[in-house]
């Protein structure tokens, strides 16, 4: 939110509370993983349609790439989505990304599992309280693999364990400047 306000970009946020499967998913991942991921993918397509129709620049807090490359893949690797269902999901994903233009920049906020657990606790969403530490560790591993192989657009990686964009003005100012510099193609190297 703060980043979009400072940059004057229109924000598009992940519709967490809209997913009718999410609470069921966190209580029984095996039964609801495919349904939940398919919902997120179709919802993300709707958001991308809005992004394409929006005037000016936008900020999106979760991309279609993350849905498929991290969350759905993690569930498949944990045998929570069957190979048949995962194949259908991947077919749909590949069609979608072929039709969508890539973003101008991906900002990756790198965080440890401890930081993620702390942030989840501070949000106070009851359905997130039971997320296993191991699940977050698996997601983190897949995020690192994905971001290191992502080539569709420039990537800005920001370590965020000690980052506080809400309470520390210097942090938000620095991140805004980094984003503006990357979008404008400006890079300064200090040797």
Regions found by a protein language model. Give the residues of each.
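Flexible phosphate-sensing "switch/lid" loops adjacent to ATP/NTP-binding sites
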Residues: 18, 30, 37, 47-84, ...
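A glycine- and Lys/Arg-enriched "phosphate-lid" helix/loop adjacent to the NTP-binding pocket
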Residues: 70-144
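Hydrophobic/aromatic beta-strand patches that form the interior of the parallel beta-sheet core
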Residues: 12, 60, 105-107, 156-158
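Conserved substrate/cofactor phosphate-moiety recognition/catalytic segment
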Residues: 5-44
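Conserved nucleotide-binding/hydrolysis micro-motifs of P-loop NTPases
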Residues: 16-19, 64-66, 111-116, 162-165
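Short glycine-/polar-rich loops that comprise or flank the Walker A/P-loop
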Residues: 9, 100-105, 151-154
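Walker A (P-loop) phosphate-binding motif
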Residues: 1-3
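NTP-dependent small-molecule kinase module
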Residues: 118-191
